[in-house]
Amino acid sequence: MENRNTFSWVKEQITRSISVSIMIYVITRTSISNAYPIFAQQGYENPREATGRIVCANCHLASKPVDIEVPQAVLPDTVFEAVLRIPYDMQLKQVLANGKKGGLNVGAVLILPEGFELAPPDRISPELKEKIGNLAFQSYRPDKKNILVIGPVPGKKYSEIVFPILSPDPATKKDAHFLKYPIYVGGNRGRGQIYPDGSKSNNTVYNATSTGIVRKILRKEKGGYEISIVDASDGRQVIDIIPPGPELLVSEGESIKIDQPLTSNPNVGGFGQGDAEIVLQDPLRVQGLLFFFASVILAQVFLVLKKKQFEKVQLYEMNF
């Protein structure tokens, strides 16, 4: 009888442990996936809209600058650098998901021409690997190798992101041609203000959803506020929930209007996009150009020599 009770107790403890482990996994997995800006991939087939706007701007509402640097021209089947700079004040702190302050992270999307893709590891030189650091790039879609995403990564370490890119070879890829191509890039620093499902993050300003008087402000145990607003005309009460993070701007007894800010705007980051152009250069065209320059130089040399020879003949005839 005692053995049976012991077995039941052990079975109960194992079942409880498994349940707790599953709950922790689900919660952790959700928080991690929601922390990445690239989870917007699930909602957009292409990160660049027909208007030219990159969809990251739908969640990162503030506008900030970025800078993209690529070579003017590259040869086929060549590895080159695309350098993205995301400047911001390193002293700034952002509001984290738990309402505390922390450093800013950065993320980026690089939209290359068809045929261009991330360089394989065996084609990357040691010098370039050192510039890249520990960054792990991935394709926006398995069938869109020309669109690369990265982030979030610590902004203090990676405010400059180096992408190793492999140019296509028209001899093996029929879709590639020796032309001038556009390159588009988007980069953000800091967390977004809106999640892909349309809900607000705690990194944005919260406005009143009704006109009336602030009847009560309840500070929640884990941070944030519940603000009770009573409409003076009909007595209707509305409760606005403020998550931890933004600073409260109103007080009890204050009259407010609909859409009036209840909090400050804690966002210190933002998103920016830019573009550049790159030429996929034909090696035969380069060789032809070099041959032309060499021909011009040789022609100039022969012309000078011929002129000197003619002057000598003239001088000789004058002496006679």
From Swiss-Prot:
Cofactor(s) listed: heme
Alphabetic keyword roster: Chloroplast, Electron transport, Heme, Iron, Membrane, Metal-binding, Photosynthesis, Plastid, Signal, Thylakoid, Transmembrane, Transmembrane helix, Transport
GO biological process, one term: photosynthesis
Claim: Heme is one of the keywords in the record: yes
Localization per record: Plastid, Chloroplast thylakoid membrane
Positions contributing to heme binding: 36, 56, 59-60
Topology of this chain in the membrane: Single-pass membrane protein
GO function term, MF aspect, one: heme binding
InterPro entries per the UniProt record, alphabetical: Cyt-f_TM (IPR024058), Cyt_f (IPR002325), Cyt_f_lg_dom (IPR024094), Cyt_f_lg_dom_sf (IPR036826), Rudment_hybrid_motif (IPR011054)
Cofactor binding remark: Binds 1 heme group covalently.
Membrane-crossing residue ranges in chain numbering: 286-306
UniProt cross-references to SUPFAM superfamilies, sorted A to Z: Cytochrome f subunit of the cytochrome b6f complex, transmembrane anchor (SSF103431), Cytochrome f, large domain (SSF49441), Rudiment single hybrid motif (SSF51246)
Domain of life: Eukaryota
Signal peptide stretch: 1-35
A GO cellular component annotation in the UniProt record: chloroplast thylakoid membrane
SUBUNIT field: The 4 large subunits of the cytochrome b6-f complex are cytochrome b6, subunit IV (17 kDa polypeptide, petD), cytochrome f and the Rieske protein, while the 4 small subunits are PetG, PetL, PetM and PetN. The complex functions as a dimer.
Family classification: Belongs to the cytochrome f family.
Role played: Component of the cytochrome b6-f complex, which mediates electron transfer between photosystem II (PSII) and photosystem I (PSI), cyclic electron flow around PSI, and state transitions.
Name by which UniProt lists this protein: Cytochrome f
Organism: Hordeum vulgare
